[in-house]
A protein has these predicted regions:
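Low-complexity or membrane-interfacial segments used for flexible interactions
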Residues: 1-102, 106-114, 118-133, 139-143, ...
């Protein structure tokens, strides 16, 4: 007896219908953009700065002009900024503390983070021909504010303004600004008259006043910790202006 072969199964109506396409799930990664730190970030967590001034004696001896160098430190004695003065060689010998200049502020890596420009202004307490004004740029080329002198016959006053001209602080000093056997403070107030800080020029003794004051000196500024870094930079610039105005001999 002949055996019948098994029937051949019919081909599927659609070729490869039994092959399923693999399901691939692609997770979309979320890119987190970290904001670039502000160029003045070193001031973000400080509430006081201590400044040491040193005259570059070699420049004076070799007739290269009178130029200062400043070292700005925190309360922990960490060096924050180094400031170099730039001016024409002759103005320091004739204009003294009123000389026009530029201050280049550099951080610990040597990067210039701020520049202070001070034009010449002939100023005196009794007959102010011109009032003092400095402009602050951070980064260099971008103005963040200015410090301007207000004429008063008794107590010196200065206003701190942002780049748009809005006043944010004003500084008021004592009637006598000579640092002799006492500390000299300029108090800092906001627009509501609330004290937010002060600058201080400390008395360091009679020997220092007689022999060392023209070469090296120390002063500082204190302010509220929660101020923005631009405002802290403006107060630092105001402190430097006060030193040139009253104590640069």
């Amino acid at each position: 007896m002949m055996m019948q072969a098994a029937p051949i199964p019919a081909a599927p109506s659609e070729p490869y219908a039994y092959v399923k396409e693999p399901l691939v799930q692609v997770e979309q990664s979320t890119l987190e953009v970290t904001p670039e730190p502000h160029i003045l970030q070193d001031l973000s967590s400080v509430d006081r700065l201590f400044i040491t001034k040193r005259l570059r004696v070699r420049n004076v001896l070799f007739l290269r002009g009178k130029k200062n160098r400043f070292f700005v430190r925190t309360s922990n004695q960490n060096l924050v900024y180094t400031i170099e003065e730039q001016n024409s060689w002759w103005v320091g010998y004739f204009c003294y503390g009123l000389r026009p200049l530029q201050l280049h502020v550099r951080d610990g890596s040597g990067k210039e983070v701020m520049r202070i420009n001070r034009p010449y202004a002939c100023t005196s307490r009794i007959l102010p021909c011109q009032l003092q004004r400095i402009q602050v740029f951070s980064p260099p080329g971008t103005m963040i504010g200015s410090i301007e002198q207000v004429w008063t016959a008794v107590r010196p006053e200065y206003v701190v303004k942002r780049e748009n001209g809005d006043r944010i602080f004003w500084l008021r000093g004592p009637r006598v600004t000579i640092s002799c056997f006492r500390d000299i403070q300029f108090h800092i107030y906001d627009n509501d008259g609330i004290a937010v800080g002060s600058t201080c020029k400390r008395w360091q003794g009679i020997l220092h006043a007689m022999f060392l004051a023209p070469v090296t000196d120390r002063f500082g500024v204190a302010f509220n910790r929660d101020l923005i870094v631009q405002d802290k930079a403006l107060l630092l610039a105001a402190t430097l202006l006060l030193d040139y105005m009253y104590y640069d001999v």
